[in-house]
UniProtKB/Swiss-Prot annotation:
Protein name per its UniProtKB record: Uridylate kinase
Any GO BP annotation: UDP biosynthetic process
GO molecular function, one term: ATP binding
Catalytic activity: UMP + ATP = UDP + ADP
Activity-regulation annotation: Inhibited by UTP.
Listed NCBIfam families: pyrH_bact
Broad class of the protein's primary localization: cytoplasm
Subcellular location per the Swiss-Prot or TrEMBL entry: Cytoplasm
Pfam families per UniProt: AA_kinase (PF00696)
EC nos: 2.7.4.22
Pathway linked to the protein: Pyrimidine metabolism; CTP biosynthesis via de novo pathway; UDP from UMP (UMPK route): step 1/1
Length: 244
């Protein structure tokens, strides 16, 4: 689905994808066909003139909190989860470059053989040259989620919005899978999200976006063409922002 030549209001965005999205219909791992489809949508967005940062979770491979719940040391489990995000970043880089999109991976845990370290000024230069920058390994420290990493990078890179592509089409007042009466918000303010513990991102990520006035747009990336619709201000989504 093509995008308008100029997306209103956005010059630079950060797109956060949950790791589970990369599984496609599988139960584990990376579905390369599905990654290629998402990569095409990201390419279309970039071709519209947007500067794009990406952050991808690692839940399709390993989730630190799940490992800790099974008796692993929490810090060790979190580092394993960070490495999973690097694997996902490399998979997305490969898919994007097969489409002719120049892409760089920057990791908060240095691994010179496979990617660059996170260097803000270098990342800005990549974006200015039309490259996509994928940030991996969260914030580089345990006890922080990839959502917090996404919020940090969005603030650091002065992004106009943080788009969160998940398996759910927005933010609800209850779990729509358990409560058929759950209602989806069109817009909701940061403080309501925090006070009501709405499942958008973890509290530190929401607070960081609030403090830097970065809107959070939650939508389902599983529906083909949805990224284009959201960027055009259409489609089903929830926007988290300051109270009007």
């Amino acid at each position: 689905m093509s995008l308008p030549s100029c997306v209103p209001g956005y010059r630079r965005i950060l797109l956060k994808l949950s790791g589970e999205v990369l599984m496609g219909e599988q139960q584990f791992g990376i579905d390369t066909d599905y990654v290629a489809r998402v990569a095409q949508e990201v390419k279309d967005a970039r071709d519209s003139g947007l500067e794009i940062c990406l952050v991808i979770g690692g839940g399709n491979i390993f989730r630190g909190m799940a490992g800790a719940a099974k008796g692993m040391d929490r810090a060790q489990a979190d580092y394993m989860g960070m490495l999973a995000t690097v694997m996902n970043a490399l998979a997305m880089q490969s898919a994007l470059e097969q489409l002719g999109v120049p892409t760089r991976v920057q990791s908060a845990i240095e691994m010179d053989k496979v990617c660059e370290p996170v260097i803000r000024r270098r990342a800005e230069r990549h974006l200015e040259k039309g490259r996509i920058v994928i940030f991996a390994a969260g914030v580089g420290a345990p006890y922080f989620t990839t959502d917090s990493g996404a919020a940090l990078r969005a603030a650091e890179m002065k992004c106009d919005a943080l788009l969160k592509g998940t398996s759910v089409d927005g933010v609800y007042n209850a779990d729509p899978k358990k409560d058929p009466a759950a209602k989806r918000y069109e817009t909701v303010d940061y403080d309501t999200v925090l006070a009501d513990n709405l499942k958008v991102m973890d509290a530190s990520a929401v607070a960081l976006c609030r403090d830097n006035n970065i809107p959070i747009v939650v939508f389902s990336i599983r529906e083909r063409g949805n990224l284009a619709r959201v960027l055009a201000g259409e489609g089903t989504q929830t926007t988290v922002k300051k109270e009007a």
